Amino acid sequence: MTRIARCLNTPYHHAIVASLALATIGISRALAQDEDVVDPNNPAIGAEVLRLPGLQDLGRRSSGAQVEVLLALRFNHPDELQQLVWEQSDRNSRNYHRYLTSDQFAERFGPTLEQLERLTSELQQAGFQVTKTSSNRLLVHATAPAVTVENYFKTEIHSVRQDSNDDRYMNVKPALLPDALIPLVKAVHIDNLVVAKVGVRPDSITGPIQGPDNGFTPVALANSYSFPVQHGKDGKGHTAAIIIDSDILDSDLNAFFAFFPINRTGTITRESVDGGIIGSPSNGTDFRETALDTETIGGLAPGADIVIYVIPNLADVAINDAANQIISDKKAEVVNMSFGGGEKIGRAHV
């Protein structure tokens, strides 16, 4: 499972999260299962074809049916960015641990306003409606009829069924960027498939998985690993973010913290991204992962604030939007994403 973490008791550095998270958003299919891989060095390839188990192809999508696309713009000065990342980890460099704020990162390496305007103009002229742009100019959402998307990106879009009756669609041919977009766009997402899943599940052995005599308590973990909370550092003044597709009831969290007991002084708040449901569990049993993540962070850093970014599903678009909102909100120093899929598998080359 993917769990991104940094110690909550360390001095606060702006934008190590910003630079790393921004760098991952533009990469097409970080959570991909198995794709039709074409030449990875071809800048015209905006999106490959994602292969997921259990998909049922329902045929070509109606020409007038709406399709949402997400475009991730390229960073400026990529060589300079790569060098800076190396220097920030080099003890002999003057840039060692000298991190940028999210605003500094966006100004130095992010897309410019002129580049964003060029992209939105190209899309609008092609018949797209630009529905949202991120504050750091990195992500652009747009919608258009399927036939417009197919013609513009030289692809073919099919409707598919994926584990439910929700309306899902995907490109079944690689999507090609028009010449005008190649210098501006790193990747485009032309599907709304759920590409990740949580991993929490009941233990296969018999007996309860919770309670005073089963499993390790927060105190047991804190003592065994000599966590900072056992040395007077409870995370106060720091904030952790969780990206997940279900909320968890406060009553459940309160029961957990009261049982052990843990004196929580930090806050737990929610942010809805792309219509994620706040106030009740959603997406089947995924709330168990939310409970596990929130209780783990809240139990081992009781003074830290936690912001749960609730997304509607574990599709690429929602995951990227949540990561980008965390960067724009400038609250969290650490991000937890406890979900994942199979590694990307490409063709073997001799």
Positions of predicted regions on the chain:
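Bacterial N-terminal signal peptides
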Residues: H14-G26
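Short hydrophobic "helix-edge" motifs at membrane interfaces and signal-peptide entry regions
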Residues: A18, S135-N136
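Boundary at the C-terminal end of the N-terminal hydrophobic targeting segment
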Residues: S28-A32
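Bacterial N-terminal signal peptides that target proteins for export
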Residues: T2-V17
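Generic alpha-helical structural signal
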Residues: T2, G26-I27, D286
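Substrate-binding/charge-relay-adjacent region of secreted/lumenal peptidase catalytic domains
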Residues: Q33-S135, H141, A146-R347
